[in-house]
């Protein structure tokens, strides 16, 4: 480096090698991202032209399509323009969580101005300061915030439902072009001088958020939670990365956001969210099957959080700054064992270097700790009206920058000094290691301790010194609390911490109250500790580290002595009296790591360390115990006695089943029973009234096929016939679906569950091969059909005593089981034969009843939105080549059955299932054959993830279902992005995949009744040939035989695409009626599907336009 730059100052050399310099240059070349030419509101306008009817915003208070959002923002922009608002103006916006907040921000940018989010929780004094700094003339606010903003001294335009301009076809607004460097927004953060500082971001930097979607795994099918405050960078990222991609933004109410976040996310079918690890800790993946991607930031993930979440979602960690629009780095997908908790990943939108924290002219070697410096198109412009702070943070590039830039690349105007300590890992990823200054992070939000210390000095009487820091008591499970250390004047003690006087504690209460009028709630300390002395370092500075360390040695019980009023006054009325008080005391003891015996009814949980996050956890825990609380209840009534009085009794959410109650009326019940008495001998005089339920759509589908399924387990060894007979009888008693018969009358098809059926084990002895004999047994039944009013369940045992070989044959109708539940039957037989007790299980009737208990409104609304404007893709819409004759065609004159095997199929990309890969390939084939960008096909789902039924996995029965899936094909997408889109689209449907297809069509679409899905994809990833483990015998072979034709009444208008792993690779079968698809066409479909499966998996970087090219 010296030879290339002889004039470089010695101080700029540092201790970095030429090899490291070259590596940094390569890493930064990979990360460089060009700025966009479009402005954010132009990008969203383009999405409105592409997807006019698609839902852009789904909020608790209504929805907007992209067209509605764009038009309303244009109308509001014209209102602003008529008031003289334009480029370089700042417009404050203040909204509770609402769809109108999105309109407001977009409108301000369309007017050419910059929006300034003002969170409704901010105290009036801070709002006035923001208005004064921005010199704003007009603000936009919701109904509830209009008065408060007006009282702050500004003209307010109220933005609410009365503004709905849907019927106005031509917007009044005419495009304004503020310029790429004009301000787009300004965010205010904590400032070290006691006042917040405004960070101004220009239009070009703002628009660059659109380029982050692929790295964040946000695509047009995503449903993104809007959780963060719009006053923080991540709140804006949630909104504008979503809208610039054509995805849907989901906005719960403030109440749901704080009190029942998991429920809100599930009801809105959220697939993507960004949350701080602290907030994430209040949730469980078990409660949100809809979630696909979880991104965290602001704090490091704990190892326990990775363990909990990584197996269930795509887990990422990002790094962003207020001074950098959107994300700057994002990690690879995090798995349980291979990602350090502080690894923030790789730059996605610029370049970075790590320099000496005390001298940014000196670069640090790879692996050494230093200050992170960044250069990115996303960078903010300045701190509003604060040139000194701007100059200190946005620096001229040091001399070493020239050596780091590739040829013909322009020198950056500035670098941003983040103040964050970091180091490069050997793979180019970055580890975040804290701050070089005293800046704090509270639940992911930036806090300058100097600002709080300034206010505390003014508010505390007779204060000698103050320190604000994050401190973590020993029993806090690693959760640090914002802590104020107060040294009063004339205080003199050898003890670091001293017990508070009554006057001190009363002063703390007064100071808390005053702070609520000055700073945001998250900046109010949880703990106030009185000091006997202020520890100092050898250089005479306040020893913050020692204060943190000493708090880290305190148990909660010892800490209470330094912070509660009761300790100073003497404890009064300590006994918990009501059941609600006792329940709440146990909840808070668990959350705050206290001995429940030390809590009394007058204890203030806020004084004991509670905050909004622990309050959210308390709300959820209380609901489970039957108490209804909200976060606002907790803050309004912080003592246990008051809280117990404000709590409401709520029902628990467990599903209650009543097996003696039917879902059919008395007339239908009597018709069913009369039929069985007349046609069968199954009901005798001692028979209790059996359970009668409607047959599900899937049961009707399988009954229409009118065929039996046979499973033959070839067993080598000695069999105990009596034990086998008893095992089969026990299985029938265990699973009521095996005792079910079907009855059809004018009202439909119904299933009748009997208390018992004949369960004889038919025994056949032979000298021949038992497998051959078994096949002979079911061959004569090929033309027979399932009789509705007779049990399908039958057990047979074929034995060759000389060969000590047997075949245990189970016969059922597919209306009694599905692949996922088959092991429940086999396991029951094996457990009983082997002498083990059976575990309790639910019945298929519990599943049906749970389905009927669901409120279907949200489900039908989802399907209505999901399928709006789309229709199924049919074979008649395809243009086939159809030149190759199939080599494997069914002999059934009406049936086409083509097989295609992919030898050595490729592994699926990370995070993608084989079912997704096959559906994606199928959608591409249909897109190519129809030349359509939107494909709707059918998919088989197991139907067990969407119902709140604990133990649903123990049910034997056909819970599977057929539902539509909508796939979009964007030619510029890479294969990887397309695969994630297909998988995310599937996951969206899982919350409501229990609904009957016929009902979805009737309630949620304009399709004709009985519309077929065109093509239905079914990936068989369950081994129906699983072994049965019986004592003294070896299961040497399993045979699965399906009788009857593949084509029956309900299959005559659809093509079925089956896929299954086999020993030779992956087998793909195309089945259907010859009236729908010919054998050559089916062969063409199978071949193309196989080719696309391999290309998508092996070339994830390839664009769809190239993959689909003829």
Curated annotation (Swiss-Prot):
Pathway: Secondary metabolite biosynthesis. Pfam families: AMP-binding, Condensation, PP-binding. SUPFAM superfamilies: Acetyl-CoA synthetase-like (SSF56801), ACP-like (SSF47336), CoA-dependent acyltransferases (SSF52777). One of its GO terms (molecular function) is phosphopantetheine binding. GO terms for biological process: amino acid activation for nonribosomal peptide biosynthetic process; secondary metabolite biosynthetic process. CDD domains: A_NRPS_SidN3_like, CT_NRPS-like. It comes from the Eukaryota. Keywords: Ligase, Phosphopantetheine, Phosphoprotein. InterPro entries: AA_adenyl_dom, ACP-like_sf, AMP-bd_C_sf, AMP-dep_synth/lig_dom, ANL_N_sf, CAT-like_dom_sf, Condensatn, PP-bd_ACP. GO terms for cellular component: cytoplasm. The modification O-(pantetheine 4'-phosphoryl)serine is found at residue 612. Residues 713-1025 are annotated as: Condensation. Residues 575-651 form the Carrier domain. Nonribisomal peptide synthetase; part of the gene cluster that mediates the biosynthesis of benzomalvin A and D. The pathway begins with the loading of amino acid precursors onto the A domains of the non ribosomal peptide synthetases benY and benZ. BenY and the A1 domain of benZ are loaded with anthranilate (Anth), while the A2 domain of benZ is loaded with phenylalanine (Phe). N-methylation of Phe by the methyltransferase benX may happen before loading of Phe onto benZ, after loading of Phe, or after dipeptide formation. Belongs to the NRP synthetase family. NRP synthetases are composed of discrete domains (adenylation (A), thiolation (T) or peptidyl carrier protein (PCP) and condensation (C) domains) which when grouped together are referred to as a single module. Each module is responsible for the recognition (via the A domain) and incorporation of a single amino acid into the growing peptide product. Thus, an NRP synthetase is generally composed of one or more modules and can terminate in a thioesterase domain (TE) that releases the newly synthesized peptide from the enzyme. NCBIfam families: AA-adenyl-dom (TIGR01733). This is Nonribisomal peptide synthetase benY. It comes from Aspergillus terreus.
């Amino acid at each position: 480096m010296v030879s290339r730059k002889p004039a470089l100052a010695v101080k700029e050399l540092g201790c970095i090698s030429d090899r490291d310099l070259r590596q940094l240059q390569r890493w930064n070349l990979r990360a460089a991202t060009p700025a966009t030419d479009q402005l954010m509101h132009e990008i969203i306008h383009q999405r409105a032209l592409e997807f006019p009817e698609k839902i852009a915003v789904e909020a608790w208070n209504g929805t907007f399509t992209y067209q509605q959002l764009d038009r309303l923002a244009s109308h509001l922009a014209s209102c602003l323009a008529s008031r003289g608002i334009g480029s370089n103006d700042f417009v404050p916006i203040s909204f509770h969580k609402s769809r109108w907040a999105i309109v407001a921000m977009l409108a301000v940018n369309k007017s050419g101005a910059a929006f300034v989010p003002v969170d409704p929780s901010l105290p009036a004094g801070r709002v006035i300061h923001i208005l004064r700094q921005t010199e704003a003339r007009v603000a936009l606010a919701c109904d509830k915030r209009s008065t408060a903003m007006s009282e702050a001294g500004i003209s307010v335009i109220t933005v609410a439902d009365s503004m709905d301009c849907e019927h106005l076809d031509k917007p009044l607004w005419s495009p304004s072009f503020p310029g790429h460097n004009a301000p787009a927004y300004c965010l205010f953060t904590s400032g070290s001088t006691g006042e917040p500082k405004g960070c101004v971001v220009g239009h070009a930097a703002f628009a660059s958020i659109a380029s982050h979607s692929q790295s964040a795994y946000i695509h047009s099918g995503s449903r993104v939670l809007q959780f963060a405050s719009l006053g923080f960078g991540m709140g804006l990222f949630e909104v504008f990365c979503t809208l610039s991609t054509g995805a849907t933004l989901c906005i719960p109410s403030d109440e749901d956001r704080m009190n029942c976040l998991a429920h809100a996310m599930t009801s809105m079918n959220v697939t993507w969210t960004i949350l701080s690890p602290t907030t994430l800790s209040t949730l469980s993946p078990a409660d949100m099957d809809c979630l696909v991607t979880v991104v965290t930031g602001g704090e490091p993930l704990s190892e326990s959080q990775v363990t909990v979440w990584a197996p269930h979602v795509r887990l990422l960690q990002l790094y962003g700054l207020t001074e950098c629009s959107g994300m700057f780095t994002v990690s690879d997908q995090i798995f349980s064992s291979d990602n350090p908790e502080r690894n923030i990943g790789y730059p996605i939108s610029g370049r970075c270097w790590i320099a000496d924290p005390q001298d940014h002219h000196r670069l640090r070697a790879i692996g050494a700790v230093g200050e992170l410096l960044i250069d990115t198109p996303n960078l903010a412009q300045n701190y509003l009206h604060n040139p000194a702070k701007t100059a200190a943070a946005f620096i001229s590039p040091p001399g070493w920058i020239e050596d780091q830039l590739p040829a013909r690349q322009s020198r950056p105007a500035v670098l941003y000094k983040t103040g964050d300590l970091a180091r490069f890992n050997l793979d180019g990823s970055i580890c975040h290691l804290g701050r070089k200054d005293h800046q704090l992070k509270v639940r992911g939000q930036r806090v300058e301790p100097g600002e709080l210390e300034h206010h505390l000095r003014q508010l505390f009487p007779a204060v000698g010194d103050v320190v604000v820091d994050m401190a973590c008591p020993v029993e806090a499970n690693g959760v640090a609390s914002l802590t104020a250390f107060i040294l009063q004047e004339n205080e003199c003690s050898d003890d670091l911490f001293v017990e508070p006087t009554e006057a001190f504690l009363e002063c703390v209460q007064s100071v808390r109250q005053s702070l609520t009028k000055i700073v945001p709630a998250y900046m109010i300390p949880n703990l106030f500790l009185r000091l006997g002395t202020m520890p100092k370092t050898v250089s005479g500075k306040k020893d913050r580290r020692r204060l943190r360390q000493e708090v880290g040695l305190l148990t909660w019980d010892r800490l209470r002595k330094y912070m509660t009023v009761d300790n100073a006054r003497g404890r009064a009325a300590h006994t918990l009296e009501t059941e609600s008080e006792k329940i709440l005391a146990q909840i808070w003891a668990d959350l705050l790591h206290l001995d429940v015996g030390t809590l009394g009814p007058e204890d203030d949980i806020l004084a004991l360390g509670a905050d909004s996050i622990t309050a959210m956890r308390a709300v959820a825990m209380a609901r489970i115990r039957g108490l209804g609380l909200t976060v606002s209840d907790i803050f309004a009534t912080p003592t246990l006695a008051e809280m117990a009085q404000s709590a409401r009794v709520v029902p628990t959410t467990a599903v209650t089943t009543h097996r003696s109650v039917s879902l059919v009326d008395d007339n239908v019940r009597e018709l069913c029973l009369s039929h069985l008495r007349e046609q069968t001998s199954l009901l005798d005089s001692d028979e209790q009234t059996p359970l009668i339920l409607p047959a599900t759509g899937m049961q009707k589908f399988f009954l229409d096929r009118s065929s039996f399924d046979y499973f033959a387990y070839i067993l080598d060894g000695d069999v105990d016939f009596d034990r086998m007979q008893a095992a089969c009888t026990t299985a029938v008693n265990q699973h009521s679906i095996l005792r079910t018969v079907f009855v059809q009358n004018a009202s439909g098809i119904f299933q009748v569950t009997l208390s018992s059926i004949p369960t004889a084990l038919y025994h056949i002895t032979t000298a021949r091969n038992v497998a051959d004999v078994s096949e002979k047994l079911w061959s004569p039944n090929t033309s027979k059909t399932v009789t509705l009013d007779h049990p399908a369940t039958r057990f047979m045992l074929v034995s060759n005593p000389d060969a000590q070989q047997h075949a245990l044959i189970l016969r059922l109708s597919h209306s009694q089981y599905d692949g996922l539940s088959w092991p429940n039957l086999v396991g029951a037989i094996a457990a009983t034969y082997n002498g083990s007790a059976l575990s309790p299980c639910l019945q298929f009737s519990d599943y049906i009843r749970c389905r009927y208990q669901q409120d279907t409104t949200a489900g039908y609304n989802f399907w209505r939105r999901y399928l709006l404007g789309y229709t199924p893709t049919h074979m008649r819409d395809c243009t086939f080549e159809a030149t190759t004759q199939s080599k494997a065609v069914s002999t059934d004159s009406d049936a086409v059955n083509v097989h295609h095997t992919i030898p050595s199929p490729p592994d699926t990309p990370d995070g993608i299932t084989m079912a997704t890969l096959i559906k994606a390939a199928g959608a591409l084939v249909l897109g190519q054959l129809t030349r359509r960008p939107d494909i709707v096909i059918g998919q088989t789902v197991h139907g067990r993830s969407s119902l709140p039924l604990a133990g649903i996995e123990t049910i034997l029965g056909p819970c599977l279902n057929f539902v539509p899936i909508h796939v979009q094909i964007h030619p510029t997408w890479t294969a990887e992005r397309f695969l994630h889109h297909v998988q995310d689209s599937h996951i969206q449907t899982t919350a409501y995949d229990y609904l009957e297809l016929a009902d979805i069509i009737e309630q949620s679409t304009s399709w004709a009744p009985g519309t077929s899905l065109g093509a239905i994809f079914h990936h068989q990833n369950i081994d129906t040939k699983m072994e049965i483990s019986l004592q003294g015998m070896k299961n040497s072979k399993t045979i699965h035989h399906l009788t009857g034709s593949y084509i029956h009444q309900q299959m005559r208008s659809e093509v079925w695409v089956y896929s299954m792993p086999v020993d030779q690779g992956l087998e793909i079968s195309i089945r259907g009626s010859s009236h729908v698809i010919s054998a050559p066409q089916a062969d063409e479909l199978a071949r193309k599907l196989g080719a696309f499966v391999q290309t998508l998996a092996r070339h994830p970087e390839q664009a769809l336009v190239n993959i689909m090219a003829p």
